[in-house]
Amino acid sequence: MIEEKTYKIVYRKQFLEDIQLHKRAGRKSVLVKLAAIIEELKKHPMRGTGKPEPLIGDRRGQWPRRITAKHRLIYEIYEDVVTVDLISAAEHYGHK
C-alpha cells in the first residue's frame, strides 16, 4: 500500500497580510476558496482547483492558483521537506 504524503503548509508574511486585506474588504468568498485550495495543497500541490502550473522566468519555481479573476495564490513546493510555502494571495503576481 502506497502512503500518500501530506505537505506541511508554511505562511509567509505577505500571504498573511493578504488574508487580512481580504478580511477587511469583506471578501468571504475569496477566504472560503483559499481555505479549500490550501486543503488541496496538503495532498497534491501540483494539480487541482485554480489551474496550477509552474511559473517561468524570474518566478521559476513558483506556482499560481486562480482564486478569482483578479487574485492569485502564489506558492512554492519543496519536495525534499514535503512543504508548500504560501507566498501571496492577492492581485496577480504582486502587481498591486
Task: Give a label for each model feature.
Residues 1-8, 16-32, 36, 56, ...:
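Enriched for short, Lys/Arg-rich terminal
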Residues 8-9, 48:
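Residues that recognize and position ribonucleotide moieties
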Residues 39-65:
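A short, surface-exposed loop/turn module that caps and links secondary-structure elements
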